[in-house]
């Protein structure tokens, strides 16, 4: 047993590396990573709900350990509420809020932070166990440890974002920091998902080089889809951050026009791309539509091509998720039902993951 553990941690023996590369070990590690990906996707939903509730500023301290325990007594609740009363959001937006109202915004943010801790536990504990038992191939060990560290960095970015909302004159977090927080979370989710695919389908099982060359065009279309979806997601973070979904709730026109008359209301002009509600909504509409057209074109081309079965399935899933995504976006806008918008944000990550899957299935073996 001791020799097995040493081989697992150091990976210096052929037997240890063979165990890590076995189908059983790969399956176990892949399942763990897919579960982690699912938990991260759920975190997007919780975060979106927190934002819709304007609850993100309700907890005034970042306490990774002691913050696990919420207020348990009336006096503790009053102390927490008193801290909230010191920030501009309470003074300008929520003055007169009672303790029950404060609890209503406290709990979503507390759950959001607890879910982050759960993610750290879910990723960190199995990682240690897999390393100790030699279930992870040597080439993946530094990368998986890096992913765990990046998860902690995401927590720091989250607090950096929240802290921006405590500044004088501000009643919500910085739109720019919100975008960084969301985009970093998306990158982390996709990195975990792609790593799971790598574990499940190692290099030696990929397409032969000559076959991969034949599908180079489809692979480029998958990469193009990744780029288009990513750009639309980034634009969506500024729509969400400015609450631009609260205006111009018609489709496809805005205020009876294709381009809203107040698109360039802010000066200098560049601010409109990030801080002008009309502009951020128009940009997301436009970029989302461009992404939809581009992705659908890729899916149609993939269906017509003689792709391997799994690659074809990936493109079909991407197409289905794209249609759902567009319907969710338009429905959120015209109905003003924010819960649909939460699903829209969740589905965006799944759509991007499907595009990554399609690209991954067309990769060739190393020469």
From Swiss-Prot:
| Reactions mediated catalytically | Fe(II)-heme o + 2 A + H2O = Fe(II)-heme a + 2 AH2
Residues binding heme: 284, 344
Cellular component GO terms held in the UniProt record: plasma membrane
Family matches, as InterPro entries: COX15/CtaA_fam (IPR003780), HemeA_Synthase_type2 (IPR023754)
**Cellular compartments annotated:** Cell membrane
EC code(s) of this entry: 1.17.99.9
GO biological-process terms attached to the record: heme A biosynthetic process
The protein's name is Heme A synthase 2
């Amino acid at each position: 047993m001791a020799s097995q553990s040493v081989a697992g941690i150091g990976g210096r023996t052929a037997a240890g590396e063979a165990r890590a590369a076995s189908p059983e070990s790969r399956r176990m590690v892949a399942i763990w990573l897919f579960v982690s990906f699912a938990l991260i996707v759920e975190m997007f939903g919780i975060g979106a709900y927190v934002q819709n509730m304007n609850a993100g500023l309700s907890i005034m301290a970042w306490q990774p350990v002691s913050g696990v325990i919420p207020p348990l007594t009336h006096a503790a609740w009053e102390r927490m509420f008193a801290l909230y009363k010191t920030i501009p959001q309470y003074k300008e937006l929520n003055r007169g809020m009672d303790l029950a109202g404060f609890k209503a915004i406290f709990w979503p943010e507390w759950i959001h932070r607890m879910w982050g801790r759960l993610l750290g536990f879910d990723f960190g504990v199995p990682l240690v166990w897999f390393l100790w038992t030699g279930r992870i191939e040597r080439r993946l060990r530094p990368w998986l440890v890096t992913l765990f560290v990046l998860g902690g960095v995401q927590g720091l970015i989250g607090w950096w974002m929240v802290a921006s909302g405590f500044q004088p004159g501000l009643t919500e977090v910085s739109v720019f920091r919100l975008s960084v927080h969301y985009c970093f979370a998306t990158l982390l989710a996709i990195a975990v998902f792609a790593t799971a695919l790598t574990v499940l389908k190692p290099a030696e099982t990929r397409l032969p080089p000559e076959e991969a060359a034949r599908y180079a065009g489809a692979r480029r279309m998958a990469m193009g889809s990744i780029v288009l979806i990513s750009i639309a997601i980034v634009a969506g973070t500024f729509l969400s951050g400015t609450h631009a979904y609260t205006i111009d709730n018609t489709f496809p026109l805005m205020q009876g026009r294709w381009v809203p008359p107040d698109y360039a209301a802010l000066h200098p002009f560049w601010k409109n791309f990030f801080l002008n509600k009309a502009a951020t909504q128009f940009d997301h509409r436009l970029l989302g539509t461009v992404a939809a057209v581009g992705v659908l074109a890729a899916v149609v081309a993939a269906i017509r091509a003689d792709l391997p079965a799994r690659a074809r399935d990936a493109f079909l899933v991407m197409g289905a998720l794209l249609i759902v995504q567009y319907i969710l976006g338009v429905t959120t806008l015209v109905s003003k039902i924010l819960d649909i918008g939460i699903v829209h944000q969740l589905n965006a990550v799944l759509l991007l993951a499907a595009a990554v899957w399609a690209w991954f299935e067309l990769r060739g073996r190393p020469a």
